[in-house]
């Protein structure tokens, strides 16, 4: 009887599968790196567009609250926060102390996120709810630009609650008065609010300059606009519209200075709180316009 053979002559001729060579591996890694370099900016752009969409929605909601407030208050705009002893759109009142019912401002020298979340946000949110918009704007998170929460300068502000500020024009750039929607100088395309310039915050390095930039809920137009979204920022107008405005267009209306930086409405040489039509410091704005509502 012939015994079965267990030899595998054919298998002896099979060569093991070859692995990747070093060069092939490096080529694959290079291709992955190129694809990542191409995709990451696109993904960042998608994220930024999503944040801007939420940003515009925030502005619309705040502006709707402004219009509703006007409808219920003889067409007046709300107090903007320059008079710290009365209710305004962002709070019941403002204070650097800790009396009950007032919005306590954070320190000009800054702090950490934990400090602000623990010490100031628990006070500033209830103060907002007691302010003029408390019954119109139920969710205080609407006051924050989605990309602002990633900004370290957020924790060097006194007014920690809102990324947006109102135009000082709503009180005619002075304390104690408020404009009306029905005023002849108020037009539908007048800019009522915008994203504040997050780069201008008080720090020990600059001698706590710009302390007035974030100590309330309103600014002069030439105190600056946000750079979070590149060369434009969100604004809202008196007719309720909200959109992204090119920074160059904003500063054509607001007025710029030789340094290229916004000067601030209360800068030296600008008279009583306005830089409109003032060229002594190089301001190029001509009032009235969409930002400087009044001559």
Question: What kind of region is each of these model predictions?
Answer:
Residues 1-20:
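N-terminal leader/signal peptides at the extreme start of proteins
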Residues 4-6, 30, 37, 41, ...:
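Residue-level signal for well-ordered alpha-helical scaffold segments within enzymatic catalytic domains
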Residues 5, 12-13, 37, 74, ...:
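Generic N-terminal simple sequence motifs
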Residues 7-10, 23, 29, 63:
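Generic alpha-helix initiation/capping and coil-helix boundary signal
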Residues 17-57:
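Amphipathic alpha-helical segments typified by the pilin-like N-terminal helix
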Residues 53-295:
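Short, well-structured segments within or immediately adjacent to enzyme catalytic domains
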């Amino acid at each position: 009887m012939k015994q079965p053979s267990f030899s595998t002559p054919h298998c002896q001729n099979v060569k093991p599968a070859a692995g990747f060579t070093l060069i092939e591996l490096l080529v694959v890694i290079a291709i992955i790196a190129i694809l990542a370099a191409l995709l990451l900016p696109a993904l960042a752009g998608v994220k930024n567009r999503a944040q801007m969409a939420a940003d515009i929605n925030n502005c619309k909601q705040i502006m709707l609250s402004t219009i509703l407030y006007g409808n219920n208050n003889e067409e007046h705009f709300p107090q903007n926060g320059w008079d710290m002893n009365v209710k305004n759109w962002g709070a019941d009142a403002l204070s650097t102390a800790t009396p009950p019912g007032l919005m306590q401002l954070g320190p000009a020298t800054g702090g950490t996120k934990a400090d602000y979340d623990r010490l100031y946000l628990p006070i500033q949110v209830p103060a907002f709810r007691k302010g003029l918009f408390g019954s119109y704007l139920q969710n205080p998170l609407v006051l924050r630009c989605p990309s602002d929460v990633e900004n370290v300068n957020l924790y060097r502000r006194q007014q920690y609650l809102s990324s947006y500020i109102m135009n000082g024009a709503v009180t005619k750039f002075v304390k104690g008065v408020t404009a009306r929607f029905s005023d002849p100088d108020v037009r539908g395309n007048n800019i009522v609010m915008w994203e504040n310039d997050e780069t201008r915050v008080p720090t020990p390095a600059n001698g706590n300059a710009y302390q007035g930039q974030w100590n309330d809920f309103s600014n002069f137009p030439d105190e600056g606009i946000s750079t979070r979204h590149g060369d434009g920022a969100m604004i809202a107008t008196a007719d309720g519209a909200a959109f992204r405005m090119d920074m160059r267009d904003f500063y054509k209306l607001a007025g710029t200075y030789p340094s290229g930086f916004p000067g601030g409405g209360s800068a030296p040489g600008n008279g009583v709180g306005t830089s409109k039509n003032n060229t002594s410091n190089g301001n190029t704005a001509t009032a009235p316009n969409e930002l400087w509502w009044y001559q």
